[in-house]
Design a protein with these regions (language model features):
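Conserved beta-strand-loop-alpha-helix hinge in the C-terminal portion
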Residues: 79-80, 84, 213-238, 524-541
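ABC ATPase nucleotide-binding domain signature region
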Residues: 30-33, 45-106, 361-429, 508, ...
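Hydrophobic anchor residue at the start of the ABC signature
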Residues: 152, 180, 462
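Conserved H-loop
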Residues: 197-203, 224, 407-408, 510-515
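Conserved beta-strand
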Residues: 7-10, 17-31, 59, 342-361, ...
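ABC-family P-loop ATPase nucleotide-binding domains
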Residues: 76-144, 404-474, 479
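Coupling and communication elements adjacent to P-loop NTPase active sites across diverse families
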Residues: 1-13, 91-148, 228-349, 541
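Catalytic Walker B motif of ABC-type/P-loop ATPase nucleotide-binding domains
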Residues: 163-167, 172, 402, 474-479, ...
Length: 541
């Protein structure tokens, strides 16, 4: 029987009472499925439920076959050896003991049928570009991106029937991403992948769109899905226009009917006052008129209510594509203004900047390089979080740095309170007015940061830094699109389009870098920082 995932009447609620799923029914069959949806829709939660990391409040999750799960945030014990991280340490030790002449039965039981486990492990590492990593090395010696691939290699060695990947390309350089793409393409079983990586999602066979606790299916990859979505959106917007026209018509008809009824009432009162007919006749006529008027009014009110309901349904069918709108005139930097200077800079972990490097005016700089090259270390040094090993670094304008870990937020404070910390001179009304531009309106601004989804948390952190006082004229972002859905990436792009200061972005997401108007490309490679041409970027990232 083909391996599959069957979810029946699934309900799940977080400890604080926030519902995620109520009666969800869905099945994933053979092939590669891209699970998409806005941040906070429950994509990662669904993967964790399927993987058995979370238990449903109600309903069932059944998986035919073994499950392999790559979480969004990969953490490995740095003291482990690579073979331990791969799950083959015991078998490898038994093999070596047998090769050394120890024929104890326990060693043969440990090896089982996996006599080629070491060769398979080395092959799996090689396929993912980790052929240089020895099995006896410790995990602490590999970079963050390599640890993701190491965890994936461990899963591939297990040969699970079902593979669940949650944002697998986060923290991977372009070279590592291509290795992962190849592994995804060659996967023979059931795969469900959550990602904002368009190139990865274009490798899937179908898209499952999770929205409002329900899943809609689209055949084909992400590009095909986007085309289908555009057609749906246009149709939904047409239905809104039709429903609005009908609603206006019903309002006019109700108003006209009310005017006519008022005229009749005045005429009837006039007849009564003038007593032109017997009282009993006029009374009967008045009661009949009132009954008719009541029925007429109720009919029009019902029609109006039905039109209102159709309009609400039509509006609900249109996707909410809110965009961040930022107007920050104090972030503007004059073209000739010196923003940042580096002189013979030596970083704590070995990288260096030979000679001098200068940023002027509202330049937009991309910092690229392989995993472990030192990009984050360089940004932290510029931000003043790390002391330089040698040389000098100086920011000549107010600077703000948004790290990957988003620890600029205090999880126990609300969104509004976090922003107020960075703008102590701003009134509460001013803070909330500014937050509305970052889509935190009303009660959303009163959410605690710890309860936010990945995209919301990033948006709140970005708001805190961009709304800070003094206004940042140099903004540095470290892998900003990690953990963001497509809508959030579009929102970030819009926000950065409105930003008038200088920008330095470390990212492996080349389409995103191109969309924010990068003007200079800096490559950190083999311990040296150098400027490269845009044409060379795709070969160097």
């Amino acid at each position: 029987m083909s391996a599959s995932i069957t979810v029946t009447s699934l309900s799940f609620t977080w400890p604080d009472g926030s519902p995620v799923f109520e009666g969800l029914d869905v099945a994933f069959g053979p092939g590669r499925t891209g699970l998409v949806g806005v941040n906070g829709s429950g994509k990662s939660t669904l993967l964790r439920l399927v993987a058995g990391e979370l238990a449903p409040a109600d309903g069932t999750v059944r998986v035919a076959g073994e499950v392999g799960y790559l979480p969004q945030n990969v953490t490995l014990d740095t003291a482990l050896r690579v073979d331990e991280a791969l799950g083959i340490a015991a078998q490898r030790a038994a093999l070596h003991a047998i090769e050394a002449g120890d024929v104890s039965e326990k060693h043969f039981e440990t090896v089982g049928d996996d006599w080629d486990v070491e060769e398979r492990a080395l092959a799996a590492l090689g396929e993912l570009g980790l052929g240089h990593i020895e099995l006896d090395r410790t995990v602490g010696e590999v970079s963050g991106g390599e640890s993701v691939l190491l965890r994936l290699a461990a899963l591939l060695l297990r040969r699970p029937d079902v593979l669940l990947l949650d944002e697998p390309t986060n923290n991977l350089d372009l070279y590592a991403r291509k290795r992962l793409y190849a592994a995804v393409q060659s996967w023979p079983g059931v795969m469900v992948v959550v990602s904002h990586d368009r190139e990865l999602l274009d490798l899937v066979d179908q898209i499952a769109d999770l929205r409002s606790g329900e899943i809609a299916w689209y055949g084909g990859n992400y590009s095909v899905y986007e085309e289908a979505l555009e057609i749906e959106q246009e149709a939904a917007e047409r239905m809104v226009r039709v429903a609005e026209a009908d609603f206006r018509k019903q309002k006019r008809e109700l108003t006209d009917a009310q005017v006519k009824l008022a005229r009749r009432k005045r005429y009837g009162q006039k007849m009564w006052d003038q007593k032109r007919e017997p009282k009993i006749v006029m009374g009967a006529r008045k009661r009949a008129a009132q009954e008719s008027a009541g029925k007429h009014r109720i009919m029009h009110e019902e029609k109006l209510a039905e039109a209102r309901e159709r309009l609400d349904e039509a509006v609900e069918a249109v996707r909410d594509d809110d965009e961040i709108r930022v107007d920050l005139p104090y972030t503007a930097v004059p073209p000739g203004r010196t923003v940042l200077t580096l002189q013979d800079l030596g970083l704590r972990y070995g990288a260096r900047v030979k000679g001098g490097l200068e940023l002027r005016g509202p330049e937009r700089v991309a910092l690229i390089g392989r995993n472990g090259a030192g990009k984050t270390t360089l940004l932290r040094t510029i931000a003043g979080e790390l002391a330089p090993g040698a040389g000098e670094v100086r920011a000549h304008v107010p600077l703000r740095f948004l790290p990957q870990r988003l620890d600029v937020l205090d999880g126990e404070r609300t969104v509004a309170e976090n922003v107020a910390r960075y703008a102590p001179g701003a009134t509460n009304n001013r803070v909330r007015a500014r937050l509305a531009r970052f889509l935190f309106r009303g009660a959303r601004a009163d959410q605690k940061a710890a309860t936010l989804s990945g995209g919301e948390r990033f948006r709140a952190a970005l708001a805190a830094l961009m709304l800070a006082e003094p206004a940042p004229q140099l903004l540095m972002l470290d892998e900003p699109t990690n953990n963001l859905d497509m809508a959030s990436v579009r929102q970030l792009t819009t926000a950065l389009e409105s930003y008038e200061g200088a920008l330095v972005v470390a990212s492996h997401d080349l389409p995103f870098l191109e969309s924010v108007g990068i003007t200079r490309w800096l490559l950190l490679e083999e311990g040296e920082l150098r400027e490269i041409t845009p044409e060379a970027v795709w070969f160097s990232a």
